[in-house]
């Protein structure tokens, strides 16, 4: 019998399991170059405590004290109760019906939305939406005290709601138990989806040059001299118990012309139609919310330069491109809860000039994820994913309050993961599942202080891979840019300026730079 053949199988096993091979020599852990495929799945609008506050071993609701959870009013005095959930807790047409009146006199503390003895609103029900905007998020965080979420919300006490979940209720919870859950992961920027998608791909904040002389002039925010606090309107209710706040102007732009709340892509598919008689591939540039094409360096540029293959798979992208050309309704920002509800501002690369319609760059890298992720799943099953893939589920599968529920998106992402686990590429794959931002929901952990853009509130993140530590809760400090850091590390890319600036700001404020996710993996440093 051939001794080389006898020895081959144990060596192969040892390489995979870090055990001993023939001759007793120890096989070391693989290094980061063993990872050939990186997949990022980007869901929507949930704080860590909202979904994973009960997760065993995590820094969750069991660590919340009355002092750390108590909400104060706009003037800093303790609220006697939480405000009512303005306009009701559940979305119109949703069962159960939880009206505004039914939410009166909620205790000033976190509460379970799905409590059978309370509102009994399960994860299959769509709640109303909540403010999740740049300045409001900072005002709610209140310097790290997290005590003004109710004060500066448009949704009243709903900000303090969470779900009492477990592996039987939430498919991703079960997956988190099998792999790694990061419980110290913060959204990259303050506020909402638009800005956090930009930070996912470029660690940068978009600009609108000469905005004061543009159609967007009316969207320049009115901000106090601290650069953080919106100017409150004279007719704003003095107390959060009397109604939502009103501002002089909570706009989409900063006074120095950065775009920080939802602006529309300059290219179709966009929330703004083409100009009458204009190029159907473009959004109307005269619309106040059309952002000029951006030219900052993004992760796609760095990957291209390094000859690393990559793609952004937008759920329902193909349907949205077609709808923009034909005028088909109920695809882009769908009008009902069953529509695909494609969200143009969730497609960050569609804002960049080097990915304009008609370019080879766009054709190669901005791909249709298909309805229900069908095209993305085809690429998974065939083993043809590029080295770096981003997947954005369509609107009704992304877990965003106001237009979808938790359960639909969570099950969809779990289904996608099951395909990834069976993919020919799985053995050398790392999957990161996270959320763009907190959706306005409270979380008890203070974000580390850094730069003017973030990081914002804590959000869930799962690291799923054959290399991931199993049954592990990772307490390393991360934010959305940690995904870029990981990609940068793995493919030896230059560091984006926003990442370097974020690290410098963290250090200058007495914190550590953000981790790059490798602490969640069984690989050599």
Give residue spans per PLM region.
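N-terminal pro-sequences and low-complexity stem/linker regions of secreted or lumenal proteins
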Residues: 24-525
């Amino acid at each position: 019998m051939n001794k080389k053949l006898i020895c081959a199988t144990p060596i192969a096993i040892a390489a995979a399991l870090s055990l001993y091979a023939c001759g007793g020599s120890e096989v070391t852990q693989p290094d980061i170059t063993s990872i050939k495929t990186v997949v990022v799945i980007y869901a929507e609008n949930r704080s860590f405590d909202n979904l994973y506050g009960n997760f065993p071993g995590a820094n969750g609701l069991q660590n919340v004290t009355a002092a750390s959870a108590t909400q104060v009013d706009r003037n800093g005095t303790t609220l006697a109760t939480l405000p009512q959930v303005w306009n009701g807790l559940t979305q119109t047409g949703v069962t159960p019906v939880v009206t505004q009146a039914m939410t009166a006199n909620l205790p000033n503390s976190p509460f379970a939305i799905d409590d059978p003895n309370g509102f009994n609103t399960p994860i299959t029900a769509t709640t109303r939406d909540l403010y999740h905007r740049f300045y409001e998020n900072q005002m709610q965080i209140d310097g790290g005290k997290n005590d003004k979420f109710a004060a500066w919300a448009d949704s009243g006490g709903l900000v303090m709601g969470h779900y009492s979940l477990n592996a039987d209720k939430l498919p991703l919870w079960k997956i988190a138990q099998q792999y790694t859950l990061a419980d110290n992961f913060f959204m990259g920027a303050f506020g909402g989806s638009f800005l956090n998608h930009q930070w996912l791909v470029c660690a940068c904040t978009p600009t609108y040059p000469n905005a004061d002389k543009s159609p967007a002039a009316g969207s320049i925010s009115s901000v106090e001299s601290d650069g953080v606090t919106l100017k409150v309107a004279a007719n704003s209710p003095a107390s959060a118990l009397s109604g939502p706040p009103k501002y002089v102007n909570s706009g989409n732009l900063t006074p120095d012309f950065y775009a920080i709340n939802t602006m529309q892509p300059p290219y179709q598919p966009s929330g703004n139609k083409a100009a009458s008689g204009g190029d159907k591939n473009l959004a109307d540039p005269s619309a106040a919310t059309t952002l000029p094409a951006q030219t900052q360096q993004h992760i796609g540029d760095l990957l291209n330069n390094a000859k690393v293959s990559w793609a952004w798979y937008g759920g329902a992208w193909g349907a949205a491109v077609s709808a923009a050309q034909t005028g088909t309704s109920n695809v882009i920002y769908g009008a009902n809860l069953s529509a695909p509800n494609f969200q143009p501002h969730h497609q960050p690369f569609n804002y960049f000039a080097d990915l304009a319609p008609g370019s080879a760059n766009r054709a190669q890298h901005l791909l249709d994820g298909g309805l229900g992720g069908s095209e993305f799943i085809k690429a998974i099953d065939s083993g043809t994913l590029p080295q770096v893939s981003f997947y954005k589920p369509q609107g009704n599968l992304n877990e965003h309050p106001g237009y979808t529920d938790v359960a639909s998106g969570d099950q969809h992402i779990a289904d996608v993961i099951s395909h990834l686990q069976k993919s020919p590429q799985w053995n050398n794959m790392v999957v990161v599942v996270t959320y763009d931002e907190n959706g306005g929901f409270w979380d008890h952990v203070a974000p580390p202080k850094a730069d003017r853009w973030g990081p914002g509130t804590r959000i869930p993140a799962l690291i799923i891979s054959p290399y991931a530590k199993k049954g592990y809760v990772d307490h390393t400090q991360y934010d959305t840019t940690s995904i870029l850091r990981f990609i940068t590390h793995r493919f030896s890319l230059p560091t984006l300026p926003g990442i370097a600036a974020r690290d410098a700001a963290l250090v200058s404020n007495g914190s550590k730079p953000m981790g790059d996710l490798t602490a969640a993996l069984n690989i050599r440093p």
